[in-house]
Amino acid sequence: MSTQSRKSNSSKQPHSTHKKLDPELKFKLETLTELFPDWTNDDLIDLVQEYEDLETIIDKITSGAATKWDEVKKPSKKERQREQQQQQQQQQQAQLAAQQATQPSSQSHHNNHTHISPSHDGDHSHSAQTSHNHHQSKSSKFSSRERDSSSRSHKKSSNNAAASGPNGSGNARRERASGASRVPATSAASAASANASAVQPDHLKTAVSAAKTASSTSWAAMASDKKAAKQSAQAKKAEEQQQEQQSPQQAQHESTAPSPQQEAEPQSQSQSKSQPQSDNKSAESVSSTSTPATEDLEKPKKMTWAAIVKPKTKPSVKKSEPLEELEDLKREAAQISTEEPEAAEKVIEQVIEQVEQTPEEVVEQVEVTVVPEEVSQESEEASAQQEETAEPAAPVVPAEPEAASSEEKAAPAQPEQGTYSPVAQQQQPQQQQQPQQQQQAQQQQQQPTAYSEDKQSQAQQAQSQQAQSFYQAQPQQYGSQTPQQTPQTLQQQNAAAAAAAAQQQYYMYQNQFPGYSYPGMFDSQSYPAGYGQQYAPQSQNGSQPQTASTQQSQSGQYGVPPGYASTGRDLGAASPMAAQVQLQQQQQQQPYGGSFMPYYHFYQQSFPYGQPQYGMAGQYPYQVPKAYNYMNQYQPQQGGQTPSSQSQQGEEAQQSAQQGQATASQGQAQGSGSQGQAQTNAQQQAQLQQYYQFQQQQQQQQAAAAAAAAQQGGVPYGYSGYDFSSQATRGFY
């Protein structure tokens, strides 16, 4: 047995000599160097010695479980060996100190090292233990050979360390990583061999001394003096343990689990695994009985930079329960409500003072102005009043203070009302012309006293009203001066509002982006350009001319050059199919785009998403011009139109805006609308013709260009340079 282990030992002598590696190892190494050229031979040798199986090694490397040395910081060879020996001796001493009572014999051998301060004992108790267990199993085999070398071992420590264990430097390397380096076999075995069989149980005792913090000297200082060296060895060991905790990958060998107490057992087991010699059984039996030393709980955690760089796994933050948040809110609310009454009362007082000041100022200003500006005076006074009435309502007051303050408020308000009420009545006729909001504001003017009891009037409402009424008082002047204008302005406002609403709604769904279309896009009733003519919102009994102008109105709002809708209608009239479709669509909503697709109906009902588009032509066979639906977006107003037609369009648009609201102006709109159309139609059709020819030309050019590009190989498959304004690419991106 000893010969065999000796052979394997020598075969794994220092890494620098690769000549002695057995062929199997060599083969593995070659394979690995081919696969991972950036790994140094040393690192690979370590791995190969650690895991027999090539697959596991490859797996470890690819998954990042095994790390290279330079990623941490590779101490130079000599330094490493020196460190190792120091560490090992230290560990032995640590253990020996713990076992002094039971093992006088082994003590004698190491007297020369006893100067190590006991403070470090706890630190190494695990590793020492495991290493002893580990060596214990071999000591009998090695004892004869190694007793002679023990005397040499301390002098030539640096050379010898490489050959220390049965696995030689492979182990040494790994020990460095695992932070639990074994005692050099030479010294350990010679020490232990005397009482190999007798002492075995004693070796399993846990260390007794408490752990103390290891001082952290940098590795650079290692060589300088011995004590520093020993301490730094410890520091390094602690760091390495930490490092393993960051990467527990370091293989079975370093399979140290994150918390130090668990280290002892897995290490001793994994070490025994890594020696395929027959001493496995004994080593394992030892390791199974060994118990972790509890003192190491207090071991300080050293961080390597590698550990620091590694992103920490964040402890999952417990989200605060919504209930708790609710309770916090309630608490805050309670606090606020207690503070509020006083604050509210203060505010009320301030407001009342302001109210008392403002009317006088306003009146002074007003008196300065000349009589012809009565109207503006009225409006100013009105606004002053509104301010008064609105302000007292501003603070939202809890019920109790309200009662108290209501008298305060009522008092100033009443006399003022007396002075201003005539003005308010004067304004009454004007109210008819004003929009509703203002009416409300003025009505509230008439009952200032009511405010104090009115608990529902919220602060915000009051303030916003104040602002509104203040600004709206201005338009009032003009309204009263030129009464004949009001109906028109009102109408314009309404029309504009309606148009804006329609516009907004339109953009909300249909084409947010030019050139964007989705499959079901045009089957909805509301899409104005493609189908503008059929979908105009008209009364069912409407005559044909009326349809025309309504269409005009709708397309006008959406910025479709109004001629187009009519073009569509004329085409429709020309083809019987389209006319029929149009009729149907006015009676009952047709789900699919007017074309005859017999089973489409069912799809549309059973699928939540739009239907496939077989190209525009497939869906809208009766829509003759090819890209009809896109026209409006791309050329909203044709540039080439004659000025007359343009002005006519402008007219139409304006009329259409009013048309929905003011029934009176409808006849007019229809008249001019139908007049202008006749002229424009021919023109516009000609233009359309040109436009489509031009587009086709462009498409051909583009296709040619794309083909050329594809041959050069510069363009990904299926992609022809995407041009937003071209029809060709539009449906696809």
Curated annotation (Swiss-Prot):
Any one Gene Ontology BP term: DNA repair
Chain residue ranges for the region called Disordered: 1-24, 61-343, 366-497, 518-590, 633-682
Keyword Nucleus: yes
Signal peptide positions (record): none
GO molecular function terms listed in the Swiss-Prot or TrEMBL record: DNA binding; ubiquitin binding
One GO cellular component term: chromosome, telomeric region
Domain CUE: start-end pairs: 24-66
PTM annotation, UniProt: Ubiquitinated. Proteolytically cleaved by the proteasome in response to transcription stress; the resulting N-terminal form constitutes the activated nuclear form and the C-terminal portion is degraded.
Start-end of Basic and acidic residues biased regions: 68-83, 318-333
Subcellular localization(s) per the UniProt record: Cytoplasm; Nucleus; Chromosome, Telomere
Compositionally biased region (Polar residues): 1-14, 104-117, 279-293
UniProt KW keywords: Chromosome, Cytoplasm, DNA damage, DNA repair, DNA-binding, Nucleus, Telomere, Ubl conjugation, Ubl conjugation pathway
Biased composition (Low complexity): 84-103, 158-171, 180-198, 206-223, 243-278, 382-404, 424-448, 457-497, 542-557, 580-590
InterPro entries linked to this entry: CUE, DEF1_CUE
Described function: Recruits the ubiquitination machinery to RNA polymerase II for polyubiquitination, removal and degradation, when the transcription-coupled repair (TCR) factor RAD26 fails to efficiently displace stalled RNA polymerase II. Also involved in telomere length regulation. Binds DNA.
Subunit structure: Homodimer; may form higher order oligomers. Interacts with the large RNA polymerase II subunit RPO21; the interaction is direct and serves to bridge RPO21 to the Elongin complex in a manner dependent on transcription stress. Interacts with RAD26.
Family indicated by similarity: Belongs to the DEF1 family.
Protein name: RNA polymerase II degradation factor 1
Organism in which the protein naturally occurs: Lachancea thermotolerans (strain ATCC 56472 / CBS 6340 / NRRL Y-8284)
GN (gene name): DEF1
